[in-house]
Amino acid sequence: MSSQIRQNYSTEVEAAVNRLVNMHLRASYTYLSLGFYFDRDDVALEGVGHFFRELAEEKREGAERLLKMQNQRGGRALFLDVQKPSQDEWGKTLDAMEAALLLEKNLNQGLLDLHALGSARADPHLCDFLENHFLDEEVKLIKKMGDHLTNLRRLSGPQAELGEYLFERLTLKHD
């Protein structure tokens, strides 16, 4: 059934928003997996786990923000299957941060593609929404993860486990 409030909101944009919601939920699911992996007793990097669990919450909130916008515009939320994380064992913090950076770059590309579609469909409300609520945050997060990767690589010498521990204690610990 068509919405009575729908105006200048193309079905292509509506479908792209639903796909982006799914991408955010998948990212949240992946970060939840990462967060609890690093919180395990045999990994015991609580600060790293906390970092990823916070990201899980942020991505879930992003999905909700997109869904609210979808309803405000007269679109319909279509929930797709959320794919499970690509792995259950994440290895070292460096490997996990590399996977997270790739995930964020994919999310950012999804946001950029949606923004381009909004521009092509003359939807200034969508473009403004993405600019105000997503694009800047995403770039800042990618930069932060890049910085973390640089520091993790610096510390991954012959005693990589010690470097990983120091990174967690000095960079991510919130005690």
Swiss-Prot record:
Cell compartment(s), UniProt: Cytoplasmic vesicle, Autophagosome; Cytoplasm; Autolysosome
Family that this chain belongs to: Belongs to the ferritin family.
N-acetylserine modification, residue list: 2
KW Methyltransferase (keyword) present: no
Record keyword Iron present: yes
Role description: Stores iron in a soluble, non-toxic, readily available form. Important for iron homeostasis. Iron is taken up in the ferrous form and deposited as ferric hydroxides after oxidation. Also plays a role in delivery of iron to cells. Mediates iron uptake in capsule cells of the developing kidney. Delivery to lysosomes by the cargo receptor NCOA4 for autophagic degradation and release or iron.
GO cellular component terms given for this protein: autolysosome; autophagosome; cytoplasm; cytoplasmic vesicle; ferritin complex
CDD domains: Ferritin
Protein name in the entry: Ferritin light chain
SUPFAM superfamilies on file: Ferritin-like (SSF47240)
GO BP, one annotated term: intracellular iron ion homeostasis
UniProt-listed InterPro entries: Ferritin (IPR001519), Ferritin-like (IPR012347), Ferritin-like_diiron (IPR009040), Ferritin-like_SF (IPR009078), Ferritin_CS (IPR014034), Ferritin_DPS_dom (IPR008331)
Positions with a binding annotation for Fe cation: 54, 57-58, 61, 64
GO molecular function term, any single one: ferrous iron binding
Keywords tagged on the record: Acetylation, Cytoplasm, Cytoplasmic vesicle, Iron, Iron storage, Lysosome, Metal-binding
